[in-house]
A protein has these predicted regions:
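Membrane-helix interfacial "entry" motifs
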Residues: 7-11, 15, 44-48, 80-84, ...
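Membrane-interface helix-loop-helix modules in multi-pass inner-membrane proteins
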Residues: 20-93, 112, 195-198, 224-225
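Long, contiguous internal "core" modules enriched in hydrophobic/ aromatic residues
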Residues: 70-248
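Central hydrophobic cores of alpha-helical transmembrane segments
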Residues: 257-263
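Single conserved hydrophobic/aromatic residue that forms the stacking wall/gate
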Residues: 264-274
């Protein structure tokens, strides 16, 4: 509802994602299935501890298939505007929730296992909405907004392209500020990280009850000190966003979209601290 100012422009925006949205949404299901196959304990803990958050994502995603299919069924401005906002909710809420979830994972989520390895989440829903997790949600939302803006800038022209470029550049600036701010918060804000202190046997069966970790505010930087090349990962995240913003301003939209994809990949790297 922001890039397209009238029904025709909004129809153009919808048409740019129409051939791809359902395939992209399948990746959410594939990701959940892959987590269940690879790390069933992680799947059980995440989907139980983040139960209400997952439901919010699911409810938001309901708007997408219905909105794409039913928006044009009735030639009524109120009807179409309602579904435009529904599509906006379906696109904006999931990245925000996923960012908040990753922010909580970085800080640690309170849960425990019983003797049968059944996990129990001991926190509350409102504890998940802590300041650092919300900042991670801002990073995620800005990153996805920038990605969408780059895509629209490449696939459209005229006034829609101009608004998409402005939105993408603004989202890039917000993402860089929030991303760097989160790093400074980890460095100087006293947020503790985790270090695995127990021995790791690659040939042994996984047993979370046999592992121990220690919390330390310095834990975030252990791997960076041991492997200085890891600093390239956050640097590439910032550089990719800035390069994409510069390229899209120069109307090199395809190059900007590629740079944006590379920056997105670098931001997903999170080295594990092991001692």
């Amino acid at each position: 509802p922001f890039v397209g100012r009238n029904d025709v422009e909004r129809r153009v925006v919808i048409n740019t994602v129409g051939p791809h949205w359902d395939g992209n949404q399948v990746w959410f299901i594939t990701g959940g299935g892959a987590i269940f196959a690879a790390w069933p304990l992680v799947y059980a803990t995440a989907f139980s501890g983040f139960y209400w958050a997952m439901l919010v994502v699911l409810w938001a995603l309901f708007f997408r298939p219905v909105g794409f299919d039913y928006r044009s069924k009735i030639h009524n401005a109120t009807w179409r505007s309602t579904w435009d906002w529904g599509l906006f909710i379906g696109g904006a809420v999931p990245p925000l929730i996923f960012g908040v979830a990753f922010g909580n994972l970085l800080q640690g989520v309170p849960f425990g296992f019983d003797d049968y390895l059944i996990s129990t989440y001991t926190g509350t829903f409102w504890q998940l909405l802590n300041p650092f997790a919300l900042l991670a949600g801002v990073v995620s939302s800005a990153m996805i907004t920038m990605h969408g803006g780059m895509y629209l800038a490449h696939r459209t022209e005229g006034a829609i392209q101009q608004r998409a470029i402005r939105g993408a550049v603004g989202a890039a600036a917000l993402m860089v500020l929030a991303f760097v701010g989160a790093g400074l918060w980890l460095k100087f804000g006293g947020i503790e990280g985790f270090v695995i202190t127990s021995a790791i046997d690659p040939g042994a069966l996984p047993d979370p009850l046999a592992k121990t970790v220690a919390r330390s505010a310095d834990a975030w930087w252990l791997n960076y000190r041991a492997q200085p090349l890891l600093w390239l990962l956050p640097a590439l995240g910032v550089a990719g966003a800035l390069a994409a913003a510069a390229l899209v301003l120069a109307r090199r939209t395809l190059s900007a979209f590629v740079a944006r994809s590379e920056e997105h990949t670098s931001e997903l790297q999170s080295p594990l601290n092991i001692s």
